């Protein structure tokens, strides 16, 4: 990473969705929030922050809810982890869109949004640079095809959910119907803050179901294709696979 790009990234913001209930990981998550589950000796969220700081991203906003006080107590202001951390607490579960809307006042003009259970070791600096150069509203990380799916679960149970054209425009997003789709949402997307104007305040809503269809219809959602496997630690199988990778 050259010095100019590194300076740009030092002011970039990562937003991590860390408020989920972690129902697939019970009984572990009955007493600790899912992002605090240990992976190879460190809380998973710490692993995510290490990926981001390694790419020069040193500002993080954590969207927390369930047992969020434990997350704040552990990470504090982020200083001892090499970054600056702030928090947005959801009064009740608001979904991906609602959590962002709740944190609107704390968001920069654009930011990289990361699922709180996704481990994806990509070059986040390059992702952000490509977003700036593309001048698009949203740039979603799209992974391979179902036969080369995440190493954390068998390909047979991880269907494609994105349609991507040859010129990198997302043409479809379906969570339940993979027919004709050729890529997988890897759990990372760069967004312009301006999209939040499309969301209602104080209501539960989903980016995937309410915002992505609008962006796709207007040709505003582009894909950043990667061959780097991603890991979903939100299930016992995924957690075990990631633990083996990082051991």
What are these regions (language model features)?
Residues 27-30:
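Conserved catalytic-core motifs of eukaryotic protein kinase domains, centered on the activation segment
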Residues 65, 88-90, 141, 173, ...:
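Conserved beta-strand termini and adjacent loop/short-helix elements that scaffold enzyme active sites
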Residues 2-16, 38, 42-119, 124-126:
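Conserved N-terminal catalytic core of the sugar/cofactor nucleotidyltransferase
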Residues 163-168:
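Short acidic-glycine loop/turn motifs at beta-strand connectors
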Residues 134-144:
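A short, conserved acidic/glycine-rich loop-to-beta-strand motif
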Residues 57, 111-112, 119, 125-132, ...:
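Catalytic-core segments of class I nucleotidyltransferases/pyrophosphorylases
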Residues 18-25:
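Conserved adenylation A10 loop of the ANL superfamily
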Residues 25, 71-75, 242:
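Hydrophobic packing residues within well-ordered alpha-helices of enzyme cores
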């Amino acid at each position: 990473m050259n010095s100019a790009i590194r300076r740009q990234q030092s002011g970039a913001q990562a937003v991590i969705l860390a408020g989920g209930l972690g129902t697939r990981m019970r009984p572990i998550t009955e007493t600790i929030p899912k992002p605090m589950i240990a992976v190879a000796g460190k809380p998973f969220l710490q692993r995510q922050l290490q990926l981001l700081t390694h790419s020069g991203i040193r500002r993080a906003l954590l969207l927390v809810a369930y047992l969020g006080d434990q997350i704040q107590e552990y990470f504090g202001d982020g200083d001892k982890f090499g970054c600056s951390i702030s928090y947005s607490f959801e009064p009740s579960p608001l979904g991906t869109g609602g959590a962002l809307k709740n944190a609107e006042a704390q968001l920069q003009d654009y930011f990289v949004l990361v699922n709180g259970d996704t481990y994806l070791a990509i070059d986040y600096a390059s992702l952000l640079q490509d977003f700036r150069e593309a001048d698009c509203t949203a740039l979603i990380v799209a992974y391979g095809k179902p036969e080369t799916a995440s190493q954390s679960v068998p390909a047979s149970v991880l269907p494609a959910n994105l349609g991507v054209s040859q010129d990198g425009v997302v043409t479809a997003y379906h969570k339940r119907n993979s027919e004709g789709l050729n890529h997988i949402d890897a759990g990372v997307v760069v967004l312009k803050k301006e999209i939040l104007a499309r969301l209602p305040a104080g209501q539960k809503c989903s980016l995937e179901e309410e915002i992505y269809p609008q962006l796709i219809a207007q040709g505003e959602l582009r894909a950043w294709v990667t061959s780097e496997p991603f890991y979903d630690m939100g299930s016992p199988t995924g957690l075990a696979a990631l633990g083996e990778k990082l051991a």
